[in-house]
């Protein structure tokens, strides 16, 4: 069987990398020939999880058509979030937990998406449906993905299925998920050593919102005031990046993983700022707004913005 590559979105997080690794194991057990790769370097949080459970970071690829004819996607489906030459290969499988947008294929494919907190939760269900045993290290990296995406089950994206998956995977992996979860999340909140340019690209995704092209970046912290000491530098970097890449608006969501609130920095024209205010019922003051209880880009930021821009 010809080799296929499995990968998550650009600027990969723990779900994108962890689920790619776990899904590659799953598919190889079913006779496929796959390799988990990544569309970017593993961040600090993901590196912590990989080391904890004995994995090397997947190799990073920029293109895939030079290697394979077919690919499998996890944790994304939108082309602007995927590998740049995706249109030159066949997508055979997708496992996701996001909206479906700008996605089309010539041939039928396996596609499974569910409104749960993490793609690894969907994969956990697939393991159970197949009565497949999950190795301890695979359980650990899947557990890490769910903890990361749901902010230790505190995100509004969290479902009962996510909670059940976390409890079972933690037992298999042999860890206390609450204790390990805090260690994992804190590993990803050390932003002091990174430049503003790195931070606005670390976990950033592009979206089509009505007629606007938006870039929405997110960083997790435990000290928001410390992060905002670099506010002017953040805004300048966002402005520069937006102009260079043709984004109509750029949002940086600074999320406090302990309090489950976010501070937003915003670059955009007056129309976009007005739509932001309409979407969240909150005016931007000096390009900044506090969003109480908002932690999820997927569920709490992109949907209201999409509705507001398309109204």
From Swiss-Prot:
Keywords, in A-Z order: Cytoplasm, Hydrolase, Manganese, Metal-binding
Residues at which Mn(2+) 2 binds: 15, 75, 97, 149
Keyword Cytoplasm assigned: yes
Subcellular location: Cytoplasm
Reported cofactor(s): Mn(2+)
Cellular compartments per GO CC: cytoplasm
Its EC number(s): 3.6.1.1
Residues annotated as binding Mn(2+) 1: 9, 13, 75
Catalytic activity line of the entry: diphosphate + H2O = 2 phosphate + H(+)
Family, as annotated: Belongs to the PPase class C family.
Name listed for the protein in its UniProt record: Probable manganese-dependent inorganic pyrophosphatase
Gene from which the chain derives: ppaC
């Amino acid at each position: 069987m010809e080799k296929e590559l499995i990968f998550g979105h650009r600027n990969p997080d723990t779900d994108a990398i962890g689920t790619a690794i776990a899904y590659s194991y799953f598919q190889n057990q079913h006779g496929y020939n796959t390799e988990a790769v990544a569309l970017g370097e593993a961040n600090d949080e993901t590196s912590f999880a990989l080391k904890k459970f004995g994995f090397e970071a997947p190799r990073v690829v920029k293109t895939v058509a030079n290697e394979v004819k077919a690919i499998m996607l996890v944790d994304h489906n939108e082309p602007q979030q995927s590998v740049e030459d995706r249109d030159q290969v066949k997508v055979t499988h997708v496992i996701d937990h996001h909206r479906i947008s700008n996605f089309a294929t010539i041939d039928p494919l396996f596609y499974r998406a569910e409104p749960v907190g993490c793609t690894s939760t969907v994969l956990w269900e697939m393991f159970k449906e197949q009565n497949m045993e999950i190795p301890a290290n695979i359980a650990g990296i899947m557990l890490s993905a769910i903890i990361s995406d749901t902010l230790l089950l505190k995100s509004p994206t969290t479902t009962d299925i996510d909670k059940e998956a976390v409890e079972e995977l933690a037992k298999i992996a042999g860890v206390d998920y609450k204790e390990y979860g805090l260690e994992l999340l804190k590993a990803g909140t050390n932003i002091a050593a990174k430049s503003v340019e790195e931070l606005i690209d670390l976990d950033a995704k592009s979206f089509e919102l009505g007629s606007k092209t938006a870039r929405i970046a997110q960083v997790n912290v435990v000290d928001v005031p410390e992060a905002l000491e670099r506010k002017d530098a953040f805004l300048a970097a966002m402005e520069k990046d937006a102009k260079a890449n043709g984004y109509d608006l750029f949002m940086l969501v600074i999320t406090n993983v302990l309090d489950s609130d976010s501070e937003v920095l915003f670059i955009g024209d007056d129309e976009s700022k007005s739509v932001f205010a309409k979407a969240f019922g909150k005016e931007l003051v000096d390009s900044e707004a506090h969003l109480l209880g908002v932690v999820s880009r997927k569920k709490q930021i992109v949907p209201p913005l999409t509705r507001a821009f398309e109204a």
